[in-house]
Amino acid sequence: MDINSNYSEEDNPLALKADFILSLCELVVGGKEGLQPVEKTVIDRCVHVVYRKYFENPTPENMPLLEDLYNALLTQDEPEARHVAAALEIYVKGSLNIFNHHSNVDIHNRIVCFDIKQLGKQLKKLGMLIVQDAVWGRVTANRSAGKSTRYYADEFHQIGRAHV
């Protein structure tokens, strides 16, 4: 759930991060229809709540975790919020909680390698979405700094297969 001030080319990086988190929740909640409008609303509301502390003091330890979103959803009155929180629970407290930690990837290195080969079937799509988000954050930060970015994807066909 990492974000930086250059995350978006627009004035509001939080709007783009909220869109990413909606996509993440769409994968987690699943279903043919995707997220319902009320679910999207409570997720968006909670995203703004959990990032408030970080934007007041943008230090790595204040970066929100998936668990912060989960806890914020549990405080909402709408039953849809509890439905989304229940779907997130396995990714927060359960056996698929691999992404509920601060990142150990130093995105500021000249070369960054993301290896998601060992992710199981349940985490593969989520892992690819998170990698794409991290790459986007790096590309926008580099663009703001006037740097070019090269992006190499091995096994690129896996990205297309995940969306089928």
Which sequence ranges carry the predicted segments?
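P-loop NTPase motor domains
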Residues: D2-H163
